[in-house]
């Protein structure tokens, strides 16, 4: 019996030592573009949020995996006043922050961190408001500065947010990545050290992964956070390998150099389905690919010109050539899977003669010259912007519009779009919270012009009144009717050429377990594991 006991102890010791010295699990994701920033409050694009938000930070609320359902996160629960204008959040206890060589947290997350994180974007007099450029495009684009009245600490674990007006999607908005909660203590220490921008370049959060380093245009590396409040991740290391070319991403995936990749070329889909080492996940995208027509640049300030450019584009031919069976022609600025989608809206048919007639009415019988900006990266809503640009260029030439194709590196491209430099630009959007407001307000409102997320500079008061009215309405049926009205106004004004809604494909290697696709086309690897080959 004693010998058996000794043997058992030896076996247990060996098992323990083998687990201690087991090779760390490293998950490599082939990311499609370099992050525009390492701070989610300074970002708007999905590639950046994949890198700078989901691994590092938490929000007050979150979305249930694979759905648009809002669930508690840093706030365990909340109360809403009868008039819908006061939200009281009760914070989770025991949430720890990361550390690094320059910062060791002395306390757990509390109300000070929540108040700091919101007020940094909301209050122009806040000491961190202008740090790192102070461009809070998403916060302003969502009209948060006109929704929020004040943010108050009630006690260490209670925060009260008062609104100027009721806002139906407010809880969903708080679950979006631009509302990440930062460490106020880290910010204060960074400010005292004369390095306030450190909170954006060497990030500290409370999320499942801890930032290690960023090699520009190459890799972003993380390690699992041992003290994460939801439990340590199953993988030990997370690496984003920046790989803009979809063909190169695929080659890396097939060779096992990365475990997952976004946005494969449509032409590769059939082969991926047959690959025994790959699981090809897919879902209908909550997205829209479109061509923004900048109404602040002549002659695009003329509604008839914008309508003519719509009639001049053969969208079905584009969908066939670029999406290759993985997309459908778009007529509205929101996807057909979203509530309030207006089926009754009539699209601009492909009609070059009608386009010429409208151009003549607008005083451009002989056409005009313009620029056509094409994204340098694959996105869920546009797998090949260069090819799409070439097709549109050919279509416009038939009606006398000569377009020069222009492109820049992704971060520079977005920066220039925000500044309003592009006359016409390919871009798109994947919904972030499941609400039509996230498309119609964020991309097309007057406040979005100020924020920089409305690349058309379209500011049309009748449209604005309907969209803001819908956001303040709590009755979903009434909101639906208002959003349907907004889609009619949008189509008449033609600030975009709506191109397509896509099917989103996500190939992963067979050893990847536990990954759930997000309706927002964001990629969260907290629950992912790697099985033995």
Language-model region placement:
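Detector for C-terminal structural segments
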Residues: 27, 51, 215, 312-340, ...
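N-terminal lobe/hinge region of extracytoplasmic solute-binding protein
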Residues: 30-82, 119, 126, 204-205
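A structural "hinge/loop" feature
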Residues: 34-50, 74-75, 101-104, 170-180, ...
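Aromatic- and charge-enriched surface segment that lines or borders ligand/interaction sites
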Residues: 76-127, 160, 299
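Surface-exposed binding/hinge segments that line
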Residues: 123, 127-187
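Ligand-site clamp/hinge motif
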Residues: 197-200, 225-271, 389
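A bilobed periplasmic-binding-protein/Venus flytrap-type ligand-binding module shared by bacterial periplasmic
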Residues: 223-226, 285-308, 312
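Structural transition elements
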Residues: 329-362, 379-387
């Amino acid at each position: 019996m004693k010998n058996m006991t000794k043997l058992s102890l030896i076996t247990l010791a060996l098992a323990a030592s083998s687990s201690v010295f087991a090779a760390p699990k490293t998950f490599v994701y082939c990311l499609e573009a370099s992050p525009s920033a390492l701070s989610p409050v300074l970002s708007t694009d999905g590639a950046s949020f994949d890198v700078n938000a989901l691994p590092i930070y938490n929000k007050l609320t979150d979305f249930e995996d694979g759905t648009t359902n809002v669930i508690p996160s840093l706030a365990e629960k909340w109360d809403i006043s009868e008039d819908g204008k006061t939200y009281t959040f009760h914070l989770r206890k025991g949430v720890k922050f990361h550390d690094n060589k320059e910062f060791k947290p002395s306390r757990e997350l509390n109300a000070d961190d929540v108040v700091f994180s919101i007020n940094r974007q909301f209050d122009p007099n806040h000491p961190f408001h202008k740090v790192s450029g102070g461009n809070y495009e998403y916060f302003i684009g969502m009209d948060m500065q006109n929704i929020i009245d004040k943010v108050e600490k009630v006690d260490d674990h209670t925060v009260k947010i008062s609104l100027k007006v009721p806002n139906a999607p407010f809880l969903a908005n708080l679950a979006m990545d631009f509302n990440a909660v930062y460490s106020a203590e880290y910010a204060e220490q960074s400010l005292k050290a004369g390095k306030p921008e450190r909170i954006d370049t060497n990030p500290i959060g409370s999320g499942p992964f801890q930032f290690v380093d960023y090699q520009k245009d190459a890799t972003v590396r993380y390690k699992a956070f041992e003290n994460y409040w939801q439990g340590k991740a199953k993988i030990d290391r997370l690496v984003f390998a920046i790989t803009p070319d979809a063909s190169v991403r695929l080659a890396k995936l097939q060779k096992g150099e990365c475990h997952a990749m976004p946005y494969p070329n449509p032409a590769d889909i059939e082969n991926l389905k047959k690959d025994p080492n790959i699981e090809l996940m897919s879902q209908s995208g909550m997205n829209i690919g479109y061509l923004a027509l900048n109404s602040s640049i002549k002659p695009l300030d003329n509604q008839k010109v914008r309508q003519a450019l719509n009639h001049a584009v053969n969208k079905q031919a584009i969908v066939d050539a670029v999406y290759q069976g993985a997309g459908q022609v778009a007529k509205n600025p929101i996807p057909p899977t979203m509530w309030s989608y207006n089926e009754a809206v009539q699209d601009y048919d492909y009609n070059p003669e009608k386009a010429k007639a409208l151009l003549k009415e607008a005083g451009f019988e002989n056409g005009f010259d313009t620029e056509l900006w094409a994204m340098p990266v694959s996105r869920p809503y546009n797998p090949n912007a260069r090819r799409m640009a070439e097709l549109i260029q050919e279509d416009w030439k038939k009606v006398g519009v000569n377009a020069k194709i222009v492109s820049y590196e992704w971060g520079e491209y977005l920066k220039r779009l925000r500044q309003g430099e592009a006359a016409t630009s390919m871009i798109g959007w994947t919904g972030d919270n499941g609400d039509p407001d996230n498309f119609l307000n964020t991309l097309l409102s007057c406040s979005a012009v100020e924020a920089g997320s409305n690349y058309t500079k379209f500011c049309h008061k009748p449209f604005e009144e309907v969209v803001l009215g819908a956001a303040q309405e709590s009755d979903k049926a009434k909101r639906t009717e208002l959003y349907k009205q907004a889609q009619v106004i949008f189509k008449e004004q033609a600030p975009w050429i709506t191109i397509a809604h896509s099917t989103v494909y996500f190939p992963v290697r067979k050893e990847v377990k536990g990954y759930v696709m997000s309706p927002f086309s964001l990629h969260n690897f907290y629950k992912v594991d790697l099985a033995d080959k």
